[in-house]
């Protein structure tokens, strides 16, 4: 059956199609948008809310849906028991339960050999059965097998050293059967069992408290790399512990930091005493299990493995009972235990304080191993586990186990893998395995006493080996994420070198540190505009990104906190080539001094009584000012490109009102040309300077094109900074203080700072922390980045510098001395920089209204007017869409502030916008050039803007 062709061509059809949209709306900032559109809830706490309506009443009622959800959370077994699919899951659960139960029997028998403590195996069996039932009811992992784990029990060796029995031979690795007729042996043995029960009880209480207090959320912050590394280290510890069964030798087992290498050395020293029969049996089991991986069985399309572990346990147990094999088994260990079963008793509460440290260590390791293993298994089957519920479940298991004077229980790594791969789908498999284990231990325990320990070691190593294969994924993990690879290596090495308990603490601490660094190390991108669109992308990603003259756009890609806010400020200052200068004490005092104190400054000492409450300390406006970085005068200059002249005659008068200008031509860029002398241009319009502008010939026009740097353009100075907060979800209180001071400092430097794409949650955070005042209002917050850019372009650009001429192509550089810079910044301290398109903000009343011109030559006219006042007869061409024969007719004007009257538009404005320099040199064109230019203008008139707003007409000054 072939799929529908329409479905196949869906992606191709829509990939080839292009969609356009045309939206007409005003430029919105946060202030006028909230005025026009009503919000559902108040954004600040100082607004009265009418709670008389029914929708605001708190409804405290319990529905059946909520009750059922709460019941299924506390008792997860109800979900799988009520919806159990017998036809699909029953056979797999039975097969997995039989495999797990048969493997658990020899593990219980040989546990005393590894844990160096002799507990009646029937007590451990009863405790394991109760633990499986409890976890089946309260646990959330479907394939988890609960039981004793040697590595967890080995952490209690320090407790056994304080309460030894049998003269401590077990701890030294020598198994000598004690004299049961000695009464002191029973006293020491019972005291040792009481200590183990106390440790297990306190461990369960700690885990139960952690689950009820919700400490399971910590697992959500532990990355997958840390979990994988910890399980790999656990697998390596398990492999090392099984060397006792593989080689048939006993060593003095060590625990704690560097114990891993001490045990390796002890095993190497004991290799001459290794049992060859045990090694051969181990290799036989490994080969059989390896071949078994090639056998594929599926039941109802669910893959399962052949239960080879069942045949190995039953086969070698039967063979060893018929044939005497010279290998290590559990028979000798069972003969050293004085009791076959001890009835449950209440643990001793008097020594809980003595085992507090060991219990806390066991609680961390056992709960972490259970949760990590559960998350790993659940990720394979695409479901989630509840970490808090698992902590409660394992805590109850250990509390119940303490009454049987058993070990601490956790997730058994090898049996969990066996239950998963043999088809176990729900906790019903664990219940089946626990029932089979208890039944066989009560009726047929001696049948398994002669089972070789090497067979059990082969089964365990074969099943935990896949967790160690994660080492092979390190190269790919390094290529994907270096931070995760670093977490993996640190977790693995700490768990190996320092042990599972201390290594766990180090791994979690390091993972939290890396996550904190990643979350607070924000990425600041400099954005530009994709031509003819409202899309803004980073300059590092796209080649056609265009810079907007006078505007810098910074995108913050993370939360802004006290950690990275200074990096944001430093990045902004670097991009706009400015440095921060700390204010002096006199300048800070001037900021905080009140007007009424000016009359009493002459008094040295004043004494008066003031019984009123002390007023709150004034807000720090800013503690530093921003200045252009020294050595980069290009940030302080305005470059204007003029036409080429053959001669220049200047008549000038020196006075204090004149401003120095340096005329730099193309000869300054090339040492082959002669240097240009400095001239003085008058700043007073009453004074004039007469310059003759001869017409350039065709030869000179062609020569102009060959001048070096003749086509270079330099952007105007920065007047607006836009911060894109569309990816910012949090701004803390300290970061808001730094941002507020940064806004004020930039305002003092005549640079306006706008925020775009600010989330409502961040806006409420700004309001709660009193971010807005008379100088910073919501008019500086824009809904989108394009709104902020349009507003920045609608503002009047900085006034262009005076014009001068030279015999060659001339570039005028406006320079100021350091004293003039400081005086200019002081004059502009109280000057505001923002004017909302729709409403005025009260904090910016000192700034005169920007002149919104209908034509696109705002700065051009002021430059032409100055040039005419100084006697400069210039003919500037802005490459605008006008008729070729249209010319600017000179006008004699006495007033410098006279505005240029708007001319009616001859044709619609073009749709394409390109941002270039404001001024270009006019070059007399030949008729051929004029005709070609006219044709390009006609072609550009074919694309018409969908709409034209009066508020954006000043933006045409950047359109060429």
Curated annotation (Swiss-Prot):
N-glycosylated. Residues 662-957 are annotated as: Interaction with RACGAP1. Keywords: Anion exchange, Developmental protein, Differentiation, Glycoprotein, Ion transport, Meiosis, Membrane, Spermatogenesis, Transmembrane, Transmembrane helix, Transport. Residues 884-904 have a biased composition (Acidic residues). GO terms for cellular component: plasma membrane; sperm annulus. Residues 807-857, 881-960 are annotated as: Disordered. CDD domains: STAS_SulP_like_sulfate_transporter. It is a multi-pass membrane protein. It is found in: Membrane. GO terms for biological process: cell differentiation; chloride transmembrane transport; chloride transport; meiotic cell cycle; spermatogenesis; sulfate transmembrane transport. The chain crosses the membrane at residues 94-114, 118-138, 140-160, 202-222, 223-243, 269-289, 354-374, 391-411, 428-448, 454-474, 495-515. Residues 926-935 have a biased composition (Polar residues). Residues 1-93, 139, 244-268, 375-390, 449-453, 516-960 are cytoplasmic. Glycans are attached at residue 190. It catalyses: sulfate(out) + chloride(in) = sulfate(in) + chloride(out); oxalate(in) + chloride(out) = oxalate(out) + chloride(in). Residues 541-792 form the STAS domain. The keyword Iron does not apply. It comes from the Eukaryota. Residues 818-827 have a biased composition (Basic and acidic residues). It holds the Pfam family STAS. Residues 115-117, 161-201, 290-353, 412-427, 475-494 are extracellular. The keyword Transmembrane helix applies. Belongs to the SLC26A/SulP transporter (TC 2.A.53) family. Interacts with RACGAP1. Interacts with CFTR; stimulates anion transport activity of CFTR. Antiporter that mediates the exchange of sulfate and oxalate against chloride ions across a membrane. Stimulates anion transport activity of CFTR. May cooperate with CFTR in the regulation of chloride and bicarbonate ions fluxes required for activation of the ADCY10/PKA pathway during sperm motility and sperm capacitation. May play a role in sperm tail differentiation and motility and hence male fertility. This is Testis anion transporter 1.
């Amino acid at each position: 059956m072939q799929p529908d062709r329409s479905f196949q061509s869906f992606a191709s059809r829509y990939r080839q199609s292009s969609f356009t949209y045309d939206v007409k709306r005003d430029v919105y900032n946060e202030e006028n948008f909230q005025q026009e559109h009503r919000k559902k809830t108040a954004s600040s706490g100082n607004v009265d809310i009418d709670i008389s309506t029914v929708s605001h009443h708190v409804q405290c009622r319990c529905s059946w849906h909520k009750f059922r959800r709460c019941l299924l959370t506390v008792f997860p077994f109800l979900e799988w028991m009520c919806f159990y699919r017998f036809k699909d899951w029953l056979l797999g659960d039975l097969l997995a339960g039989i495999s797990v139960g048969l493997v658990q029997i020899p593990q219980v028998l040989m546990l005393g050999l590894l844990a160096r403590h002799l507990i009646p195996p029937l007590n451990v069996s009863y405790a394991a059965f109760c633990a499986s039932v409890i976890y089946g009811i309260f646990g959330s992992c479907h394939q988890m097998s609960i039981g004793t784990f040697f590595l967890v029990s080995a952490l209690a060796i320090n407790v056994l050293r304080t309460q030894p029995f049998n003269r401590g031979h077990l701890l030294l690795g020598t198994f000598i059967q004690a004299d049961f007729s000695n009464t002191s042996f029973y006293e020491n043995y019972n005291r040792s069992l009481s200590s183990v029960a106390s440790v297990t009880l306190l461990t369960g209480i700690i885990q139960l408290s952690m689950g009820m207090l919700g400490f399971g959320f910590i697992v959500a912050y532990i990355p997958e790399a840390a979990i994988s590394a910890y399980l790999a280290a656990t697998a390596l510890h398990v492999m090392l512990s099984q060397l006792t069964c593989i080689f048939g030798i006993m060593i003095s087992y060590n625990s704690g930091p560097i114990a891993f290498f001490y045990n390796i050395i002890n095993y190497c020293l004991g290799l001459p005493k290794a049992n060859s029969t045990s090694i051969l049996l181990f290799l036989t089991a490994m080969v059989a299990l390896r071949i078994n991986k090639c056998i594929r069985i599926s039941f109802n399309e669910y893959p399962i493995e052949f239960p080879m572990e069942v045949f190995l346990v039953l086969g070698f147990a039967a063979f060893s009972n018929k044939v005497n094999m010279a290998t290590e088994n559990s028979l000798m260990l069972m003969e050293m235990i004085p009791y076959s079963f001890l009835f449950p008793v209440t643990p001793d509460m008097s020594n809980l304080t003595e085992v507090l440290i060991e219990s806390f260590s066991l609680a961390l390791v056992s709960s972490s191993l259970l949760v990590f293993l559960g998350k790993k298994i659940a990720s394979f089957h695409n479901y989630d586990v509840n970490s808090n519920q698992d902590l409660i479940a394992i805590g109850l298991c250990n509390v119940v186990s303490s009454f049987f004077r058993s070990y601490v229980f956790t997730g058994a790594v090898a049996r969990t893998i066996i239950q998963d791969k043999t088809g176990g789908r729900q906790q019903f498999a664990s219940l089946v395995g626990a029932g089979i284990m208890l039944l066989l231990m009560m009726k047929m325990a001696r049948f398994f006493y002669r089972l070789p320990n090497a067979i059990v070691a082969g089964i365990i190593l074969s099943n935990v080996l896949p967790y160690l294969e994660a080492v092979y994924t390190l190269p790919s993990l390094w290529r994907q994420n270096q931070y995760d690879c670093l977490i993996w290596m640190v977790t693995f090495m700490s768990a190996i070198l320092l042990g599972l308990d201390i290594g766990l603490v180090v791994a979690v601490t390091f993972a939290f540190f890396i996550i904190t660094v990643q979350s607070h190390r924000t990425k600041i991108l400099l954005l530009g505009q994709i031509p003819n669109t409202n899309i803004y992308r980073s300059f590092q990603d796209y080649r056609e990104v265009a810079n907007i003259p006078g505007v810098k756009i910074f995108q913050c890609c993370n939360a802004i906190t006290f950690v990275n806010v200074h990096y944001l400020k430093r990045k902004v200052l670097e991009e706009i080539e400015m440095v921060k200068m700390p204010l002096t004490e006199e300048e800070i005092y001037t900021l905080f001094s009140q007007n009424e104190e000016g009359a009493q400054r002459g008094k040295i000492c004043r004494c008066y009584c003031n019984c009123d409450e002390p007023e709150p300390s004034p807000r720090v406006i800013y503690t530093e000012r921003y200045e252009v970085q020294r050595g980069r005068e290009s940030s302080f200059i305005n470059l204007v490109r003029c036409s080429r002249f053959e001669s220049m005659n200047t008549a000038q008068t020196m006075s204090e009102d004149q401003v120095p200008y340096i005329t730099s031509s193309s000869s300054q860029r090339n040492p082959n040309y002669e240097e240009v002398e400095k001239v003085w241009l008058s700043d007073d319009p009453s004074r004039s300077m007469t310059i003759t502008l001869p017409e350039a010939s065709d030869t000179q026009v062609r020569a102009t094109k060959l001048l070096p740097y003749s086509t270079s353009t330099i952007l105007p100075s920065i007047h607006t900074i836009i911060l894109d907060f569309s990816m910012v979800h949090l701004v803390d209180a300290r970061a808001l203080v730094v941002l507020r001071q940064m806004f004020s400092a930039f305002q003092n430097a005549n640079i306006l700072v706008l925020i775009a794409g600010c989330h409502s949650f961040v806006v409420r955070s700004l309001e709660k922390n009193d971010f807005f005042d008379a100088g910073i209002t919501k008019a500086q917050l824009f809904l989108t980045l394009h709104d902020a850019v349009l507003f920045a372009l609608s503002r009047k650009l900085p006034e262009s510098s005076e014009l001068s001429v030279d015999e060659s192509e001339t570039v005028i550089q406006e320079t100021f001395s350091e004293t003039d810079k400081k005086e200019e910044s002081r004059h502009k301290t109280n000057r505001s920089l923002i004017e909302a398109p729709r409403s005025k903000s009260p904090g910016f009343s000192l700034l005169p209204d920007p002149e919104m011109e209908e034509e696109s030559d705002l700065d051009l006219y002021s430059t032409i007017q100055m040039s005419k006042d100084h006697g400069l007869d210039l003919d500037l061409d802005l490459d605008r869409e006008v008729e070729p024969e249209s010319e600017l007719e000179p006008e004699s004007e006495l007033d410098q502030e006279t505005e240029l009257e708007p001319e009616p538009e001859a044709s619609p404005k073009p749709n394409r916008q390109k941002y270039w320099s404001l001024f270009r040199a006019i070059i007399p064109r030949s008729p051929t050039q004029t005709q070609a230019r006219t044709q390009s203008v006609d072609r550009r008139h074919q694309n018409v803007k969908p709409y034209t707003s009066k508020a954006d007409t000043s933006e045409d000054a950047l359109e060429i």
